[in-house]
Every structure is written in C-alpha cells, then in structure tokens.
UniProtKB/Swiss-Prot annotation:
Reaction(s) catalysed by this chain's protein: GTP + H2O = 7,8-dihydroneopterin 3'-triphosphate + formate + H(+)
Lineage top rank: taxon: Bacteria
Database matches in Pfam families: GTP_cyclohydroI
Family from the record: Belongs to the GTP cyclohydrolase I family.
Molecular function as annotated in GO: GTP binding; GTP cyclohydrolase I activity; zinc ion binding
Signal peptide: none
InterPro entries membership: GTP-CH-I_C/QueF (IPR043133), GTP-CH-I_N (IPR043134), GTP_CycHdrlase_I (IPR001474), GTP_CycHdrlase_I_CS (IPR018234), GTP_CycHdrlase_I_dom (IPR020602)
Protein name as catalogued: GTP cyclohydrolase 1
Binding partners and assembly: Toroid-shaped homodecamer, composed of two pentamers of five dimers.
Organism this protein belongs to: Leptospira borgpetersenii serovar Hardjo-bovis (strain JB197)
UniProt keywords, alphabetically: GTP-binding, Hydrolase, Metal-binding, Nucleotide-binding, One-carbon metabolism, Zinc
Gene Ontology process terms (BP): one-carbon metabolic process; tetrahydrobiopterin biosynthetic process; tetrahydrofolate biosynthetic process
EC number(s) reported in the record: 3.5.4.16
Keyword Hydrolase: yes
C-alpha cells in the first residue's frame, strides 16, 4: 500500500521525498489498516459471551453512538450518530457491545444504507430479540467537499426488524426516544 500512496502523491504533482510527506505513506497505511479493521473482526469475539438471561421486557436503546466510516465510492469519510434499540426476548447484551458492533461494520468501506442494515442484522443474529431498530444520521464528505458541495446536508437511514417493523406503537416509542431523549 505504501508504494501506491507514493504513486498517488506523484500523480497529483507532489514530491513524496519532501520533508512533510516522507512518512505519509506509512501513516496512510496505518490509518487505513485501522479504518478498515472491521473486515477482520468476528462478531462473536466482539460479544465475547456478554449475553445474559434476563426477563426484562422494555426497550433497550443505546443512543448517539459516534459513527465514523469511509464511503466506498470516494474513500472519503462520513460521520454521524447511530441509535440502536432492541426488544429483549429473555436475553440482554452488555451495553458496551452495541457500540462495538457498530464499529465493526463502520470500519469497512461502506454505504450508509448497508451499514445500517448490517448493524441491525448482527444484533438480531446475536440476541434473537423480538425486534431491532437502527437509525443512522450522518454527514458525507464526498457530498460536502466535492460534487454538489452541500455542507449542511445529512443522510438518515433506518432498518426496522420484528416488533419495530410490525408494531406502530413500538416504532413510535423508539422514534420519540431518539428525537427527544426523554423517557
């Protein structure tokens, strides 16, 4: 990868041997290794057995999870917030595992639509809950810095499974909670 970065620098008219760029290929490789590390992560290892028998029936929501990913079309970042909820079916998950699941899929080349679904289906697979809801709101630098240059635009995506898809009351409760944050 480092050699390819040197070639990119040359192709845009830069001198990869100048002081400020000498270590750039190494830094870019290290950054991309981290930003795409989700390809090499097994969700079961992320969850690490942190699933517990519990009779609670109320909605469990982790709000405002920071999301940083790379658009697969331009390799530019998009960033925002994810809200992930589930209705338990006699099992709950350690709350830190939800943001970790988000990170696994965000640390890949992505489109936000697929990212939203991958998170929802991963939670569904791990917990087998009565339902899962994921909403992501993000800003895409590929749309802000280039192309249409719309700096204030945001993309909202959602994936609703089970009770969140089938039951309007459950869906409304989720949407109210992510809008206001109040109970």
């Amino acid at each position: 990868m480092e050699e390819n970065i040197v070639n990119i620098l040359k192709s845009i008219g830069e001198d990869p041997t100048r002081e400020g760029l000498l270590n750039t290929p190494k830094r870019v490789k290290k950054a991309y290794d981290f930003l795409t590390s989700g390809y090499h992560v097994d969700i079961t290892k992320v969850v690490n057995g942190a699933i517990f028998e519990e009779s609670t029936e109320g909605m469990i929501l982790v709000r405002d999870i920071e999301v940083y990913s790379l658009c697969e079309h331009h390799l530019l970042p998009f960033y925002g917030r994810a809200h992930v909820a589930y209705l338990p079916n006699k099992k709950i998950i350690g709350i830190s595992k939800i943001p970790r699941i988000v990170d696994v899929f965000a640390r890949r080349l992505q489109v936000q639509e697929r990212l939203t679904e991958q998170i929802a289906y991963a939670v569904q697979e791990v917990l087998d809950p009565q339902g899962v809801a994921v909403v992501i709101k993000a800003k895409h630098l590929c749309m802000m810095m280039r192309g249409v240059e719309k700096q204030n635009s945001e993309l909202f995506t959602s994936c609703l499974l089970g009770a969140f898809k089938e039951n309007m009351v459950t869906r409304s409760e989720f949407l109210d909670l992510i809008r206001t944050g109040s109970t």
